Amino acid sequence: NPSILWEHRFNDRLSSSFNVEYLYTTGRYKFSYTKKNGYDTTEVRRNGDVRALRAEGGLFGLVRNGEWKAKVYFYNSERGYPGASVRQEPGRFRHEDRQWDDNFFVQGSFRKTFSPFYSLLLNGKYAYDYLHYLSDPRLDESTMYVNNHYYQQETYLSAANEFTFFKWWKANLAADFQWNTL
């Protein structure tokens, strides 16, 4: 399962981080049924494979009296769901269900102190998620047909203001916005 991480500091005010990872397994492994005085049957687990790719990157910066951050993330996978193993009927319930996932988001943050009396924090995020689940009786007679697709999008924005009247007296004013579909 390879993974690559690259981090770089461009200068005193800008740096980055990027990471990519790939995961794969066949999910085929031997297992044995046990009984009181030993092993009875050995089978091979099927449809337990997983394939996944994850990538993310970030930029980080400094501004006078503040900082900003930006990040992007992507994940894609496909996997099988292994079915039941029944000793009396080995291999009958093959269970060929599959699931596919896609996840993506981008987010950012900005914080700055404009004066000894006022500072600001802004945050934002957009996310997109997709899930596809398939159970097909043409591949596995023990299941009913299911072909589900789920889509979700989300946006989030936040602003926080801080006012400093005295060292012992501060006031905050914040607002959030969230939009979500499923």
Q: What does each model-found stretch correspond to?
A:
Residues 3, 17, 54-56, 103-109, ...:
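Membrane-embedded beta-strand positions in outer-membrane beta-barrel channels/transporters
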Residues 1-4, 18-24, 70-76, 122-128, ...:
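Transmembrane beta-barrel strands of outer-membrane/channel proteins
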Residues 1-36, 42, 54-62, 69:
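Predominantly transmembrane beta-strands of Gram-negative outer membrane beta-barrel pores used
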Residues 27-29, 42-52, 66-120, 124-153:
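Flexible loop and strand-edge segments within Gram-negative outer membrane beta-barrel domains
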Residues 21, 61-67, 107-109, 154-156, ...:
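A general secondary-structure boundary signal
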Residues 118, 123-125, 154, 162-182:
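Exposed, low-structure sequence patches enriched in small/polar residues
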Residues 56-63, 67, 73-79, 177, ...:
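An exposure/low-complexity boundary signal
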Residues 11-13, 23, 63-66, 113-117, ...:
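Outer-membrane beta-barrel channels and translocator barrels
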